[in-house]
């Protein structure tokens, strides 16, 4: 009763601080109503058989490294929304690290431009991924390395091939027939010379067609990387939603992290061949990966993918578990060699790539100032409206 009187007596007060306080109290009231339900859900999620986890975790100190060279890279994208257009920045960077050698930068590329705000999130992400893929191709072609490491899952690259274009597969094939030969030639030239960019970005096309043309360039670049270097690329992720090892309402990476602490790995699973269609369909993420694989394996792209592996690894005791994705099994010598170039169980070149390439909003705003962009920013307009109330 006191709470109701308190609310009724203070709602009429105009002081915004009091109104904010009331909103907070109301949130707490709703939270308390759901407290027991949330606790029960957490208890159910954490109902894990520790013995089952330990049986699937193979202990290993990774003490048999080979003399290997690794390169790794990351990308970044960000945007500022103005009322007339979006100003965006995308970038990709790669570093090389051999055992006992200093880290050196192999490639760094950025694009800053303005564009129509329609589908801007997906478009700049596509630009970023295309730059990352071309950077990987350039480094693999021009440097003496054994493996190229992506910051993140390789499977996300496959999922993105189908993102938002399910209804346009016929149009994509037509665009491939129109631009495929030219794009393939230019991608080869770019990744040989190092003059990397987005070929389709500046084509004078109607916007909807242009988006599809940009997507074809992305798929062609990914297919080229897979067909030429699939045995030498690895994805390393700090997070993962996959739960095929335990089939619980908790990601496998979380289970291995919470219920093991020693260095080791899980047996890699080739889910393309070892999991039945019913189980693949049950796991939405795996189903999306398989759909992406089937899409680019067929006409007109013809990516050569026969296997796709997922496993989890902890390179050092009491460090984080990471997810490894690859198109072939990664042997223990490679894992031992990865440990040699890692800090706290994570490859240093990936950490350095992320820190180098990150395009923060603050950085983008500083670049916009250099360009003297004076168009009003959309959120500033919203802010002015709020002040009138």
From Swiss-Prot:
Keywords: DNA damage, DNA repair, DNA-binding, Endonuclease, Exonuclease, Hydrolase, Manganese, Metal-binding, Nuclease. It comes from the Archaea. One of its GO terms (molecular function) is nuclease activity. InterPro entries: NurA_domain (IPR018977). Its EC number is 3.1.-.-. Signal peptide: none annotated. One of its GO terms (biological process) is DNA repair. Disulfide bonds: none annotated. The keyword Manganese applies. Mn(2+) binds at residues 74, 151. Its cofactor is Mn(2+). Belongs to the NurA family. This is Probable DNA double-strand break repair nuclease NurA. It comes from Methanocaldococcus jannaschii (strain ATCC 43067 / DSM 2661 / JAL-1 / JCM 10045 / NBRC 100440). The gene is nurA.
């Amino acid at each position: 009763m006191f709470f109701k009187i308190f609310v009724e007596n203070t709602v009429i007060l105009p002081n915004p601080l009091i109104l904010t306080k009331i909103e907070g109290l109301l949130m707490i009231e709703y939270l308390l109503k759901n407290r027991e339900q949330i606790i029960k859900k957490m208890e159910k999620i954490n109902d894990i058989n520790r013995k089952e986890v330990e049986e699937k975790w193979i202990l290993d100190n990774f003490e048999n490294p080979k003399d290997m060279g690794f390169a790794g890279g990351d990308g970044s994208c960000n945007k500022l929304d103005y009322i007339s257009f979006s100003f965006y920045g995308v970038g990709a960077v790669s570093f090389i690290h051999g055992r006992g050698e200093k880290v050196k930068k192999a490639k760094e590329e950025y694009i800053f431009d303005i564009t129509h705000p329609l589908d801007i999130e997906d478009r700049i992400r596509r630009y970023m991924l295309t730059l990352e893929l071309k950077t990987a191709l350039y480094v693999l072609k021009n440097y003496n390395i054994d493996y190229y490491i992506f910051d993140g899952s390789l499977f996300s690259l496959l999922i993105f091939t189908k993102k938002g274009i399910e209804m346009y597969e016929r149009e994509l094939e037509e665009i491939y027939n129109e631009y495929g030969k030219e794009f393939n030639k230019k991608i080869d030239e770019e990744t040989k010379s190092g003059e990397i960019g987005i070929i389709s970005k500046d084509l004078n096309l109607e916007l909807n067609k242009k988006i599809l043309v940009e997507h074809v360039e992305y798929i062609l670049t990914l297919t080229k990387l897979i067909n030429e270097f699939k045995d030498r690329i690895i994805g390393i992720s700090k997070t993962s939603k996959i739960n095929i090892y335990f089939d619980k309402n908790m990601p496998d990476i979380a289970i291995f992290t919470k219920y093991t602490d020693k260095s080791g790995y899980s047996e890699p699973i080739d889910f393309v061949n070892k999991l039945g269609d019913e189980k693949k369909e049950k796991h939405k993420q795996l189903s999306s990966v398989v759909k992406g694989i089937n899409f680019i394996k067929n006409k007109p792209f013809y990516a050569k993918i026969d296997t796709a592996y997922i496993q989890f690894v902890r390179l050092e005791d009491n460090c984080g578990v990471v997810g490894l994705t690859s198109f072939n099994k990664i042997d223990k010598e490679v894992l031992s060699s990865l440990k040699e170039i890692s800090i706290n169980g994570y490859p240093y070149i990936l950490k350095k790539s992320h820190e180098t390439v990150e395009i923060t909003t603050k950085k983008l705003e500083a670049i916009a100032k250099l360009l003297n962009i004076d168009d009003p920013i959309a959120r500033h307009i919203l802010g002015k409206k709020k002040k009138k109330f």
